[in-house]
Amino acid sequence: MEYKDTLLMPKTDFPMRGNLPNKEPEWQAKWEEEKLYEKIQEKNAGRKAYILHDGPPYANGELHMGHALNKTIKDIIVRYKSMAGFSSPYVPGWDTHGLPIETAIAKKGVKRKEMSIAEFRKLCAEYAMTQVDGQRTGFKRLGINGDWENPYITLLPEYEAEQIKVFGEMAKKGYIYKGKKPVYWSPSSESALAEAEIEYQDKTSASIFVAFKVTDGKGVLDEGTNIVIWTTTPWTIPANMGITVNPDLDYVVIESAGEKYVVAEALLPSLREKLGFEDATVVKTVRGSELDRVVTKHPFYDRDSLVMNGEHATAEAGTGAVHTAPGHGEDDFLIGKKYDLEILAPLDDRGVFTEEAPGFEGVFYDTANKMVTEKLEEVGALLKMEFITHSYPHDWRTKKPVIFRATAQWFASIDAFRDDLLAAVKGVNWTPAWGETRLFNMVRDRGDWVISRQRAWGVPLPIFYAENGEAIITDETINHISELFREHGSNVWFERDVKDLLPAGFTHPGSPNGEFTKETDIMDVWFDSGSSHQAVLNARPELSRPADLYMEGSDQYRGWFNSSLTTAVAITGEAPYRNVLSHGFALDGEGRKMSKSLGNTLLPGKVIKQLGADIVRLWVASVDYQADVRVSDEILKQVSEVYRKIRNTMRFLLGNINDFNPTTNGVSYENLREVDKYMLIKLNDLVKNVKDSYEAFEFSTIYHQINNFCTVELSQFYMDFAKDVVYIEAADSHDRRAMQTVFYEAVVTLTKLLAPILPHTTEEVWNSLIGEGAESIHLQDLPDVKVLADSEEITAKWDAFMQIRDNVQKALEFARNEKLIGKSMLAKVTLYVDGEAKTLFDSLEGDFAQLFIVSDFELVEGLENAPESAFKSNQVAVQITVAEGETCERCRVVKKDVGVNPKHPTLCGRCADIVVKHYEA
């Protein structure tokens, strides 16, 4: 007889190697064929809804690790909720308008000027949809479960129709108006540019220090005192309307050569030499806040220049007092509006001065730099001029410098409902908590929202103009345009004449002759995605507003979180979300931003081909995503190692229950041994902790909890000593069936707990466990937390035992290193105990040699009896010696009774009994 044939070795069809790159697409095809997404929705129909609303990625370019991080977090949440008693549909979306798509079309060599706007827009739409298709394939390959056949896409007619309604409702409430605001303007292209069309290059500019004389010091400064400003754009001096100082900085009045000057105290040391103030004396110090509304005179025009308080004035460079031209700068404009200054931008589209800048009419702005400095010198206001090289914005097409220039734009007034916005922010639950402060401060401090863009590819502003120039936005026109867009798409705006866009028979007092024109600007793309609560949450029957969760990168506080909040509060009075969760950015292994120039980009598509989607997903679960996260080949290697441990644990469990039927072979809890109960209690604790962590979106905690359970509780303890039972004992022995009961519970529980994170691997485990015709793991619910008898008492006892077991393991390791023993199975452990440890061992039941994975065990009372050589630590001493006896051929345990049965001279008594009873015919 071959004794090895009497061993009950593990058997499973679950392979050791995951082969994920090849296996995952097979599962995905099966899920699609079986309509798994729809089945999950059917299973959860009627349950409480939990709606995670997808922030739309931009439909341009290959998916990067940021996409993978974002979509995987969302998918884990939705899968968790779907297994936790909620109905949690997931509708993915895409943001499809805007400049990058126009640029991509231009790069293909399309001659934009040789076609109509409508034709150009059709090319943009086609390009956007191919990008959507490419990204959709990538997201599906990542294992993201959602309604991929019916996503929301911002260019679809039904979406645009709802966006028009949002605009109309805001206009109806008086929140939409036309005004002036500075934008990047390219004189060389004669057009406004978005930030994406700007590139920075070095440019040499005149750097000048200019004195503005005080005419009304408000009791703080004497008349005739000079406030000194610094600028690198002398050409903007003709548009100067004010000076900005920081309210929280200290400024000094100094006297030099009979003149008084005001500069920031912190900058005085550097300015003494630069401006020849070496001998200047400090007359007084004033706070920036005290200078608010002091009046100075423009250096060469007969008008006032008002001193204002603004945070953007700093003591980092210059003088601490900032020349302010509201028509030529973002900060200048915002503070100019706050102080009600004229928004003067005396340049035409080509960058040439108009008659609004007397003395410079018809001069190109760059040429005017020299003329302005000469004029300042002539009037005695120029204190210093030098040349500096600095990084300056250029038009990425023409490579020529751009300017800030105020032009007429459409705005959404934030002031009109700012208090409602702030109250809404306070009513939302933010994770991380700092998100609330961040958005609250942003909303509190933000100016009005410029919603118009002078571009072609976007949703048209649905505005008509009467003969007298009056803008027409009425319920009638808005509803009509909304329905036109719903039927034909927004291209109809560019394809039809005005009369064919207006409702039949439309009249307006401002157009006595019945003539109208239409707006040519489009909406800011943030208005597109910011309307999704109306176009998706409110419009789709399976969804609802407000959503339970918005979850995006931390850059979306100023983006989608902000625009969505603005439009939702404007039209509904409440936030579109109950909870907001944000994640950081994906950086390389050294914490650097990924970029092609650094050559450190890692693309999810490539990683999935090499390692599989479940490895990418496990990486996402392993990181503290609320901060910036790192990813590299080395980090993914570490994650793969954890995956391997989890997979091996599953394989061991599956292999050792191949002859186990839970219905007929399962052992009830009360009939289990204490050590088996202890493992089920630990498993139950894991269920509670993991479910709590899912609920708190703390996936890295789950990663560590499950990894720890598989590695420590199972691999290093229970599964290790179990081999002496499940391989060796008779198939139907009580102890073997008890351990198989625990194994079965463990594999079922772990598979369910891991399903949201590792959807492919857990499906494979589940199919191996249940067999042919198994219903998907993703149609199961998460395990419940059970109430197990005597759990506290059993846990306390066995936790204490595990600490002692650690000491025994250390002693065995020491003995191996000292060559006292080879394998631990050759050892005898003698344990010397006192006090609590003695009481503990008296109360424990079990085969301690088996539990310590040694051949022999002896318990001796009295630490004082331990020999010098014993390994000592709190309350116990461990002596390791070589076990006496022979090694049993079947179980490999060293026993004194080997050969007790003469028919089986190489077997111990236990093995001989098993063989005789169960294997001898």
UniProtKB/Swiss-Prot annotation:
Cofactor(s) annotated in UniProt: Zn(2+)
Q: Where in the cell is it found?
A: Cytoplasm
Location of motif 'HIGH' region in this chain is: 57-67
Q: What does the Swiss-Prot or TrEMBL cofactor note state?
A: Binds 1 zinc ion per subunit.
Q: How does it assemble?
A: Monomer.
Q: What family does the database annotate?
A: Belongs to the class-I aminoacyl-tRNA synthetase family. IleS type 1 subfamily.
The protein's name is Isoleucine--tRNA ligase
Which organism is the protein's source?
Listeria innocua serovar 6a (strain ATCC BAA-680 / CLIP 11262)
**UniProt gene name:** ileS
